[in-house]
């Protein structure tokens, strides 16, 4: 693995990024915008360039090049995004390798400057397989249970403490401002802030931070690989639970296989907190729709009923009990 910082006065990125995420998102699937930059990256790493193809919509630019994938990160000079995403991804990919969790393998990584922007990049192997997004809807009950057991085994290895890496903490102010709660009642938002402030959190572990359908892939040998660690944080062990529910499409078979006895001490307190904390990911937005569907009510009724944190916990308890 190399870690290069290469300065280049000539413009290599074919675009102008305004200080908003929408501007960046207009480029992330454009091979034309990134081809000169990718050619330069391959040249400085003495790698042979093959056809560049767009691979998936993500918060950063991701392209397939033969049997490899290149991920190019939002440049800090453009403003609004967290400039630590590149360093976080590298650190947590190495954490995954150390803990025995399957993930893309870093071939090379570094920073390259094109005269206006500095881009972090990572080149990894390409994993041939099917995304959880496409695989899970085809599962029968046996396959659901098998997948949930495998995910539990993976996360038990991944969600551990690691004092050798430097990544953001879950309780940094910017990470506690989740827009998913913007449409909530003021009484709930005030109680959420108070609850977080007064909670004595357990020791932090490495949390994935964005464990959604598109970030889990099943290869041809039916092995599960985790993808995209740019939003990983040090957080309590239950931080990823919200995303796990979303990953499972809120399916009760997989949820119960993964979590086991939901009546155990503090389960619902911790589950509730897992909805209060995450800065990104599905949050409570997807959960509200699942609850509304099972309760046969309008989703706005769910929003209006959550007057405080205890109301949220009681709704979760009721939802778990109906099946």
Question: For each of these PLM feature ranges, what is it?
Answer:
Residues 46-48, 65-69, 98-102, 222, ...:
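Short glycine/proline-enriched coil/turn segments at helix->beta-strand junctions
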Residues 58-66, 193-241:
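Active-site acidic catalytic loop and adjacent metal/ATP-binding pocket
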Residues 139-142, 225, 242-245:
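Glycine-rich, phosphate-binding/catalytic loops in enzymes
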Residues 2-47:
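Juxta-kinase regulatory segment immediately upstream of eukaryotic protein kinase catalytic domains
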Residues 238-266, 275-319:
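Active-site activation/catalytic loop segments of kinase-like enzymes and analogous catalytic loops
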Residues 51-166:
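ATP-binding pocket architecture of kinase catalytic cores
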Residues 22-27, 76-85, 287-302:
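Short, flexible/disordered intra-domain loops and linkers
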Residues 29-45, 111-112, 143-149, 156-209, ...:
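An alpha-helical support segment within catalytic cores of ATP-dependent transferases
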């Amino acid at each position: 693995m190399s870690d290069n910082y290469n300065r280049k006065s000539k413009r290599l990125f074919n675009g102008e990024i305004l200080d908003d995420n929408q501007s960046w998102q207009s480029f992330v699937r454009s091979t034309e915008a990134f081809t000169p930059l990718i050619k330069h990256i391959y040249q400085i790493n003495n790698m042979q360039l093959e056809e560049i193809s767009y691979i998936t919509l993500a918060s950063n630019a991701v392209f397939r090049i033969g049997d490899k994938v290149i991920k190019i990160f939002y440049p800090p000079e453009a403003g609004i995004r967290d400039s630590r995403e590149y360093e976080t991804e590298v650190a947590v990919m190495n954490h995954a390798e150390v803990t025995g969790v399957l993930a893309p393998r870093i071939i090379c990584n570094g920073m390259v400057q094109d005269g206006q922007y500095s881009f972090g990049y990572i080149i990894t192997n390409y994993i041939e397989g099917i995304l959880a997004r496409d695989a899970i809807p085809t599962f029968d009950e046996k396959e659901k249970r098998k997948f949930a057991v495998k995910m539990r085994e993976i996360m038990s290895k991944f969600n551990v403490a690691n004092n050798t890496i430097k990544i953001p903490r879950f309780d940094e102010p910017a990470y506690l401002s989740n827009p998913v709660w913007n449409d909530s009642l003021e009484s709930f938002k005030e109680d959420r802030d108070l609850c977080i402030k007064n909670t004595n959190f357990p020791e932090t572990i490495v949390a994935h931070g964005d464990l959604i359908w598109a970030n889990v892939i099943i290869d041809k040998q039916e092995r599960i690989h985790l993808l995209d660690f740019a939003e990983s944080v040090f957080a309590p062990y239950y931080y990823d639970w919200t995303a796990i529910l979303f990953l499972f499409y809120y399916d009760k078979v997989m949820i119960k296989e993964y979590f086991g006895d939901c009546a155990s001490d503090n389960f619902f307190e911790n589950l509730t907190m897992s909805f209060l904390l995450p800065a990104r990911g599905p949050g409570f937005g997807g959960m509200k729709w699942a609850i509304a569907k099972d309760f046969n009510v309008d989703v706005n009724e769910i929003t209006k009923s959550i007057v405080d944190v205890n109301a949220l916990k009681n709704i979760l308890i009721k939802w778990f009990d109906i099946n």
